[in-house]
């Protein structure tokens, strides 16, 4: 009888464990300021091997083991949120004009271009399609999309993806509360702060009072004041997010230094030493490989 009971307990343990999704694990890491695991964010998806902000770019990231994708939003003439970085579709599709010039049906007749500018068979995805694709598989960061905060919130509720999506902006806490105070505590919100700008310290102070999961720190020069503010953020219990995309965001500790100059310790290593545990990159596979050598994956 005792053995039978133990088998039953073991069975239910396996069932509960299998119910845990990859996203559950990532969400736990996101909310744990003491986790050693560094979250890798892929800028506009895997845009080197698929069109930026495309479903294929996100599928590639999932297969690669990326932790979070970053995307951008625009709205169509008929009020549908779609993925698009620029104000127009000219650079990234074979069409012309603003997304708001077209209905969704009209917009999806166009084809996305890849990173080399060649037209592909991929179409502009909606935010809802993307949420459903990524559900339980990967975290999502909405970069350009603050103006659609309320619409995004409704879609997150509809698709059951509230726990895995990070919404961000560079606005003050007072403005964000004024704009979206009714749902602010129901979403994962992250402030973006340029630590070189006047008023950065006050922004940090204000946001530490609500202890967001992370603060995105941008800086063109790593002054003692900048390093002090990052320490303050980390000590408050929020994670530090640093972009390694290009030099002006990280005082020269960028992806190209890591990959093209073969100096990852001068780039990603410096970022880790600065206390960051979330890194947004254009070189996700290389960064993942590097982090494994540092036992941070």
Language-model features and meaning:
Residues 1-23:
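Bacterial Sec-dependent N-terminal signal peptides
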Residues 19-297:
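Phosphate-group recognition and catalysis centered on beta-loop-alpha active-site segments
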């Amino acid at each position: 009888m005792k053995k039978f009971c133990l088998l039953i307990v073991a069975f239910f343990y396996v069932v509960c464990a299998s119910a845990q999704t990859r996203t559950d694990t990532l969400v736990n890491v996101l909310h744990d300021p003491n986790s050693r695991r560094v979250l890798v964010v892929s800028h506009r998806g895997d845009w080197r091997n698929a069109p930026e902000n495309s479903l294929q770019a996100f599928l590639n990231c999932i297969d690669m083991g990326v932790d979070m994708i970053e995307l951008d939003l625009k709205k169509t003439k008929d009020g549908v949120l779609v993925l698009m970085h620029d104000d127009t579709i000219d650079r990234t599709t074979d069409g012309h004009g603003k997304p708001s010039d077209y209905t969704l049906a009209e917009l999806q007749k166009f084809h996305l271009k890849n990173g080399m500018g060649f037209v592909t068979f991929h179409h502009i995805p909606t935010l809802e399609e993307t949420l459903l694709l990524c559900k339980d598989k990967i975290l999502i960061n909405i970069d350009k999309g603050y103006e659609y905060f309320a619409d995004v919130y409704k879609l997150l509720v509809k698709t059951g993806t509230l726990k895995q999506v990070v919404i961000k902006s560079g606005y003050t806490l007072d403005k964000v509360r004024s704009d979206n105070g009714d749902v602010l505590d129901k979403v994962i919100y992250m402030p973006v702060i340029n630590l070189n700008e006047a008023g950065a310290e006050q922004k940090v102070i204000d946001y530490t009072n609500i202890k967001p999961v992370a603060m995105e720190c941008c800086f063109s020069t790593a002054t003692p004041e900048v390093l002090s503010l990052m320490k303050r953020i980390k000590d408050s219990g929020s994670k530090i997010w640093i972009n390694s995309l290009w030099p002006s965001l990280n005082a020269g500790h960028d992806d190209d230094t890591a990959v093209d100059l073969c100096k990852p310790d001068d780039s990603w290593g410096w970022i880790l030493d600065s206390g960051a545990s979330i890194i947004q990159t254009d070189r996700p596979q290389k960064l993942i490989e590097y982090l494994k050598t540092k036992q941070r994956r």
